Amino acid sequence: MNAISGPNRARRVGAVLAASTCALVGCSSPPAPSVTVTPAETTTAPAPQYDFTGVPGTVLDSEDFGDRSTELSATGATLYRFVYESTSGVDNSPTAVSGVAAVPAGTPPAGGWPTVVYGHGTTGIQADCGPTLYPDLLGYQFAVQDFTELGYVTVLPDYQGLGTGGGTHPYLEPRTSGHNMIDAARAAQSALPDMSTRWAAVGLSQGGQAAWAANELAATYGQGLDLVGSVSLSPPTDLTPLVQAATDGNLTRPQKELLPYLLYGAQQVDPTIDPMDYSGTVAEANNELLLTCSGGDTDGKERAVEAMAPDEFAADSAQSEQQLLDVIGRYTLPQVRTEVPMFVAYGAKDDIVLPQWTADGVEKACALGDPIVAQEQPEQGHDVSDEAAMQFLAAVFAGQSVPSTC
């Protein structure tokens, strides 16, 4: 769930999709400039209070984003930063979520612009970790640029609690992020002209989980939209083994970096969870540092992780461990059968989301009867090739059948 590698991987989208998608929407192959993920400076202020309408997807506020992102503006796209209404996956209360939408230059295809909602990887759990607060979208400008140049209205949601929507971020709670993805599509299609109802959910790591959840929720929550498919790259489908690894002292180094986020997120789902009940002396002393955005003070974080004991995040009692497992167990995917095609790719050498965890999720989805295309990549870690995924995406937008690998 490392957000730093995500934008690099996303940059490859255009090269693969260009040939198959241009026939669909009319576009030219995008260039491939070098990648930078250095966050631009930003300032944050208290989130404004919004008057909710009771209609998820309603745009509550919007502003021009083109003058903030010169690289995206150079593509000719029209850019908006907006806040839209969504729904908490924890208590079903209305929430406000911020995002960016990019509308391609030129004439929309027959039937209107199709939409890609792109779920970003882990950026943190604090409000100022929202990509749309930064001109370069914390590096995700390249994914937005690629999909937009291919003829898709592209929407990048921050997720609840990140950016300027307000509230807290229930990190890796999939119903919330799934709702946020669906309502991002709904907001774009209700507020922008010349829109099709057809859309796809695409994401990597945390965003891969969000895309999977959006697929499962589409039938009951996504009324009025036509989800053609979802793409999940390195998605965390079951986090209970992560809790067990913490108990056993078997966490990998990058997993240790994520545990403070996970504990914070679990506390947003169950306020009786105290992250300090799962934190050793080093984690407790460095808690504020470890909860900063994923690109912040990397040297300090590395030193803290290096000093951690193997069982740094073991629960202080069997009762505490079970309490956390009860919450994290609710995150496990799949949860329901879906009839919408889904692509899942994961690396056999992934040391963050271990490959067996994803393989088990795929096996369960197959048992439910999901139309799933899964690909384990033997030489890849958390960064996986997206070539087959993008071919899948072009096919489902073209209305072609995609054989399941189950």
Question: Each predicted region: which residue ranges?
Answer:
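Catalytic-loop region of hydrolases
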Residues: 28-108, 366
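Accessory cap/linker subdomain of secreted extracellular hydrolases
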Residues: 47-50, 69, 235-334
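Short, surface-exposed "cap/lid" segments of acyl-processing enzymes
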Residues: 89-98, 102-150
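Alpha/beta-hydrolase active-site loop
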Residues: 171-192
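Primarily recognizes the serine-hydrolase "nucleophile elbow" in alpha/beta-hydrolase
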Residues: 186-255
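Short beta-strand/loop motif that positions the catalytic acidic residue
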Residues: 338, 343-350
